[in-house]
């Protein structure tokens, strides 16, 4: 069964637990037309997309008072940071920023790429999720509405909703996936562990360690097991997926901890 058809016909599997959600825009002064078009798509006023409220059953209520405008396209971070830090965000409201970025996350210039990621970090520190929009893809693109379902699904997930889940019976299992990646700019190998607390694929958390931090990785896995057991009695099995064949030295801290 195609998940897209399921969400189109029946709506998302699980809505955001937040009862108060507010959107706000972050944009360059010259990108108001882009923001207006995105706004009209999100409200369902343009052909090709029914709007966020109808597609993911999430109320779309942009707060114009929180809108942030900046002038420097090359480095908007200082302007945005100043405005964000001077704002008083209601902690009882789940905020999501629609950032119309003048800088692509794949731009060759490293300093410009960092602007993209530092802004996301700044927002996350304020407990604000964000959805980035590339203005170059919006204005003159008559097919842009085909991108809206994916954007809407991403927004729902960032609001802690669940678009769909695996069609399998729920079991008391803890699944741990261990993967690796290399940061090409600094030449450092990292190991990451992603935890899924159910066999339905619902993601819970992610932690990252350097390649030689095998004991820290083991500790992370053991904490996940203990946290799971504390709220789920009768765990049936623990499944650990490794990205490679693990050496005895790497596996031993994990096995030793599980025995205790």
What are these regions (language model features)?
Residues 1-260:
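Long, low-complexity, intrinsically disordered terminal regions
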